[in-house]
A protein has these predicted regions:
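Core catalytic alpha/beta fold that binds nucleotide/phospho-ligands
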Residues: 1-121
Length: 121
């Protein structure tokens, strides 16, 4: 799981161009204002939620995970080293200025027993 406060920052588009997959960076660059900001944070939190769930965190390349950037369509579109169909991704929006995501490997969940992996910072 990852949750971030939606805060305008100078270099978000540059970060997307350097770190995200080309299609994600293009989708963010095609937007303006609040829409671009929300798309960036949707992308970031979805990637980070997945990478935390795998146990690699931000040590793995961000462009190896391709996600949707739209508010209403959380999805893992492709993975460099895994099957995107093996993952469930949900958007989390606890407040207007917070965007987040939860990623769960579907095979880790057995009738009433979700596998939980706690990561410390």
């Amino acid at each position: 799981m990852d949750v971030e406060r939606v805060v305008p920052r100078k270099y978000l588009e540059r970060i997307a161009a350097r770190r995200f997959a080309p299609e994600e960076a293009a989708a963010i660059a095609d937007r303006r204002g609040e829409s671009a900001l929300r798309a960036f944070y949707n992308c970031w939190t979805r990637k980070e939620a997945y990478l935390k769930a795998t146990g690699t965190g931000l040590t793995a390349p961000l462009d190896g995970v391709v996600v949707s950037v739209d508010d209403k369509r959380p999805a893992i579109l492709s993975l460099r080293d895994d099957d995107p169909g093996a993952w469930f991704l949900a958007a989390v929006a606890p407040a207007r200025d917070l965007i987040g995501a939860v990623a769960v490997r579907l095979g880790d969940y057995r009738a009433g027993e979700p596998a939980v992996r706690l990561l410390t910072a």
